[in-house]
Amino acid sequence: MDWLQDLLWNPNSVAHIVFLYAFVVAAGVYLGKIKIFGVSLGVTFVLFAGILMGHFGFTGDTHILHFIREFGLILFVFCIGLQVGPSFFSSFKKGGMTLNMLAVGIVVLNIAVAMALYFILGGRIELPMMVGILYGAVTNTPGLGAAQEALNQLSYSGPQIALGYACAYPLGVVGIIGSIIAVRYIFRINFAKEEENWNQETDGTHHKPHLMSLEVHNEAIYGKTLGTISSFLGRPFVCSRIRKNGHVSIPNHGTILEQNDQLFVVCSEEDSDAIVAFIGREVQVDWEKQDMPMVSRRILVTKPEINGKKLGMLNFRSMYNVNITRVNRSGVDLFANPNLILQVGDRVMVVGSEDAVERVASVLGNSLKRLNEPNIITLFVGIFLGILCGSLPIAFPGMPTPVKLGLAGGPLVVAILIGRFGHKLHLVTYTTQSANLMIREIGIVLFLASVGIEAGANFVDTVIHGDGLLYVGCGFLITIIPLLIIGVIARSYYKINYFMLMGLIAGSNTDPPALAYSNQATGSDAPAVGYSTVYPLSMFLRILAGQMILLLMM
């Protein structure tokens, strides 16, 4: 039975480490699916499974646990950054600026409440432990990792701050969802009215491609080429088909328009009225009845060399006599403006003869198999640059130690930049949603399992004989006070839609369980929009905040 003894208890055995992690992750993920009052902890339960195993003496070599913890965290934050990168900078436009400002308010108030409790209690809770409680209260795991990284820089040897995190986390989830419910009852929210208001708001802000058939009835443009008209009008549109004297063909910039010519036009909704008024009138045309065999087909961009190129640079109209009318990216239709930058994973609508469309397909790739192949080089180039970025010391006046983004902040920043600007460096940033989610989940469960196993030895003693209940109470106050204050301000002063506010609260705390609750409460996508708008900045600030507190005050 020596083999079993070695498998279960030898902390230096590779088999023991793998066996322990496999059990902790499997048990944690399974138990995390159990719903309590309609809310499940999800993969976060892996932390508690790790604590349980650590409490009973199952552990591993400290250096191995540390490596797995940090590598898991790197994978997690990098995949998050890669996913939110394209929307990070655009989230500051229009209403996104207000939402992000409110999210910053929540982050600042969380820190203010935590520091107030720290001074009120007169140092009964050590500063590193209070930071752990802060991150448990706001359910932000990457921030905990960044704080631990900062403590490593300071050679901290006190109690595991993950104990404070684990104590505060459960009521943190409850408090976030509770604040969402509280705001609903404070303002007596009518779900049906909120959904109607949201639909009215989004109808006016979504710039989808507008398709229409027009008949030429403006004497001023008779005999003019399509290119001349487009330049004079100054509003971008695509004319994919023209019916002239009963014959349907594909027009180009040199096509001359005459009276009663019929055009199939694609443009943005806000430009449609001006284009109709300038060309003639809108008519109903059956474009299926044609004497020239033409097809409309969505073609997948899969060739890396197309990544980052402007649509107009490819000259499809002049080279292949086809028109591209719209581009679908991540489920959203975009107007095919010549300045639109194509990315791997885009689906372009091509109109032309079947032979020409096939030639365009060969240029763009149109290979689903190629799209499903993992772009490993982008992942590891990004991690390499992220660690380099995270290791650079940034000196601030008055701070005893330079700040570093660390193993959490560095990869996150680089991933956001690659997600947004990677196509300009011809880096293929496209990853299937399932692949991104798989890597992300593997990363977070490895991190949580490591933190739990390391903290487990002292957890029960801390809760029963130590200040565990005090940690829980402090965590709940850190959670609930800022959310109620900002929730009331957002609703009463800024008139934020309640469903959007749900996403704001969940996103500012980077809390998936709260988002899941919000999505269940409404059929609208408003919570997801609010969540994704504030998530990148909130995550970035959460990761930096703990480091700044520790480096400034220790």
From Swiss-Prot:
Keyword Membrane, does the record have it?
Answer: yes
The membrane-topology field of this record reads: Multi-pass membrane protein
What's the family?
A: Belongs to the AAE transporter (TC 2.A.81) family.
- One Gene Ontology molecular-function label: monoatomic cation transmembrane transporter activity
Q: What is its main location?
A: membrane
One Gene Ontology biological process: potassium ion transport
Cite a single Pfam family from the UniProt record.
Asp-Al_Ex
Identification of the protein by name: Uncharacterized transporter BF3802
- Alphabetized UniProt keyword annotations: Cell membrane, Membrane, Repeat, Transmembrane, Transmembrane helix, Transport
Q: Which GO terms describe its cellular component?
A: plasma membrane
Which residue windows are transmembrane per the record? 13-31, 36-58, 73-92, 99-121, 161-183, 376-395, 405-422, 442-464, 468-490
Spell out the subcellular localization from the entry. Answer: Cell membrane
Q: Which domain of life is it from?
A: Bacteria
Domain called RCK C-terminal: residue spans: 198-281, 282-366
Which InterPro entries did the record assign?
Answer: AAE_transporter, RCK_C, RCK_C_sf, YidE_YbjL
